[in-house]
């Protein structure tokens, strides 16, 4: 009996020492610049698991944290071979950016400067719509893609819904997986990801003309319809300026321009109720040297409660762009000029997409 007890005690001590060593490893690596952390992935399997774990990624100290998000611009470049700009879906979530070029999806971490191409999406169609989500529980990023038909087939719903998983503690197959979708719909807006759930606006119904809000649970990979919207009200947006989905005070909102510099926000209170906010910024735009026909897009709101606008178009050769902040309570605008120096890159740049909730990520690609 005594020998058995001693063995048990030694085992417990050995386990305690292992846990201490893991804590030491984490503290050592956290003190290093992120660009040097990747070198330690090859030290051992244990070190690799620690560095790639959601706990380490969340605890890594950064300048740009969720406490004070920063402004990030993503750039879309010119296709030199074809002589025109590539059509690209650009999504940001939890420190990473996803660029969707049809069947090709590129993931990049602005903090590390590293990027990876995912395996090509297998599809009978070359028209691919992509979205990007994050599950904070398992620390996994997922790309959701679906196929579409163009031209005379706008009333045909999307098909071939596929998912690719990045990161997390769970081992997953590094390939695209088909998922089931029983809701006939066709995506119409960008997406927002909140608390592990991805939302996007879409058309549904027999003729694909009825507005709805779709939801993709990043963890369970389940697609369903959250809410249907009043079709007659939504159809009044300004021609050529499609609605966009934004985060508004922790809720999902559909933002669209009814006329130049006049906007509506449809905020989802629950599945059955949407509240409408209508406002105009025409009265102040000229104070900031803006032309009457300068078009701005609602891109979200920040911690102060202000709504953020960014230009639809930006000529990067001027080396600057503008951001407008609007306070609904005080009916006041403030204007910010963002200067940048792209050097020799500017002839290749087509689109600048702003993200106002950027935080850094220690995710190593």
UniProtKB/Swiss-Prot annotation:
Residues spanning the signal sequence: none
Protein's name according to its UniProt entry: Putative F-box protein At1g31000
Start and end residues of each F-box domain: 15-62
Pfam families: F-box (PF00646), FBA_3 (PF08268)
InterPro entries the record matches: F-box-assoc_dom_typ3, F-box-assoc_interact_dom, F-box-like_dom_sf, F-box_dom, Gal_Oxase/kelch_b-propeller
């Amino acid at each position: 009996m005594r020998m058995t007890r001693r063995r048990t005690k030694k085992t417990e001590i050995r386990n305690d020492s292992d846990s201490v060593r893991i804590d030491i490893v984490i503290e050592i690596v956290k003190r290093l610049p992120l660009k040097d952390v990747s070198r330690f992935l090859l030290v051992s399997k244990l070190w690799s698991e620690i560095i790639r774990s959601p706990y380490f990624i969340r605890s890594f100290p950064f300048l740009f944290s969720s406490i004070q998000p920063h402004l990030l611009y993503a750039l879309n470049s010119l296709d030199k071979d074809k002589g025109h700009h590539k059509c690209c879906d650009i999504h940001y979530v939890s420190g990473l950016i996803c660029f969707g070029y049809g069947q090709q999806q590129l993931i990049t971490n602005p903090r590390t400067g590293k990027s990876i191409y995912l395996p090509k999406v297998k599809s009978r169609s070359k028209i691919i719509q992509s979205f990007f989500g994050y599950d904070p529980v398992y620390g996994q990023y997922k790309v959701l893609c679906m196929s579409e038909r163009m031209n005379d087939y706008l009333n045909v719903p999307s098909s071939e819904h596929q998912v690719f998983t990045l990161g997390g503690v769970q081992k997953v197959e590094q390939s695209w997986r088909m998922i089931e979708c029983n809701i006939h719909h066709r995506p119409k807006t960008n997406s927002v990801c909140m608390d592990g759930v991805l939302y996007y606006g879409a058309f549904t119904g027999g003729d694909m003309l009825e507005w709805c809000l779709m939801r993709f649970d990043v963890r369970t990979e389940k697609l369903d319809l959250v809410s249907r919207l009043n079709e007659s009200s939504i159809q009044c947006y300004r021609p050529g300026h499609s609605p966009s989905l934004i985060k508004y005070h922790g809720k999902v909102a559909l933002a669209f321009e009814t006329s130049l510099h006049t906007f509506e926000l449809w905020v989802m209170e629950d599945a059955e109720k949407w509240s409408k906010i209508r406002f105009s910024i025409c009265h102040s735009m000229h104070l900031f040297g803006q032309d009457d026909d300068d078009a701005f897009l609602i891109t979200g709101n920040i911690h102060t409660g202000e709504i953020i606008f960014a230009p639809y178009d930006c000529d990067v050769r001027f080396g600057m762009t503008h951001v407008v902040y609007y306070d609904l309570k005080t009916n006041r605008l403030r204007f910010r000029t963002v200067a940048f120096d792209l050097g020799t890159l500017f002839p290749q740049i087509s689109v600048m997409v702003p993200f106002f909730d950027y935080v850094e990520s220690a995710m190593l690609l």
